[in-house]
Amino acid sequence: MDFFYLIGGAAVLLMTFLLHRFGNAWIDRLYASHRDILTFPLAVKERGRLRRFLLPLAFLLCGARAVYIASSPVELFFLLFAAAFLLLMTATDFEQYCLFDAMMLLFAAGGLFLSLIQLPRLSDHLLAAAIGGAAFLVLAILSRGALGGGDVKLIASLGLWLGRDALLFVTMAGIVLGGFAAFLLMLLRLKKRKSAFAYGPYFALTALALFMLRSV
């Protein structure tokens, strides 16, 4: 077990460095190639300043927790994989109110691969992705822009990782937390009622917290 902690800790440190170096660079490239969908295209540098330090720091903390709770190298891999992508997507949604398909597809592929490994859970996770995605598609249409296509894809992707019961918890908690944050911002007059608001981070961070509590 001490050897596992040693190797796991080394892997976390390596991935933290890679996320700092290449994760930030990936986000910058996505911003540069998708300027037409950015909410704040003229403030990319300003809004991304804190991310360059907070992203690796958050991953390092999640990685330390993952090493502690993981029972196998495979479990640790999926925990670190999920943490990295959830943090990357949280960063882009907070900064520019957008979630990129390139990140979403890789995250969804990781969830599908995990479901295939845990074969008895496969049908539940596929159902969660289908039902969650369909439900949020309807909500996105009814909300007239409050929820976007990125949120729909995020929920469907999370379904592949979580299954129905856990996805229901994450969506309910994310809606409550996002609603509270929006209300607080309006109360402080930092947002207006019709201002754009990112809900994706509240789903992503709730899922991440759940992974850090119970593993994948």
Please give the residue ranges for each predicted region.
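A membrane-topology feature that recognizes alpha-helical transmembrane segments
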Residues: M1-V216
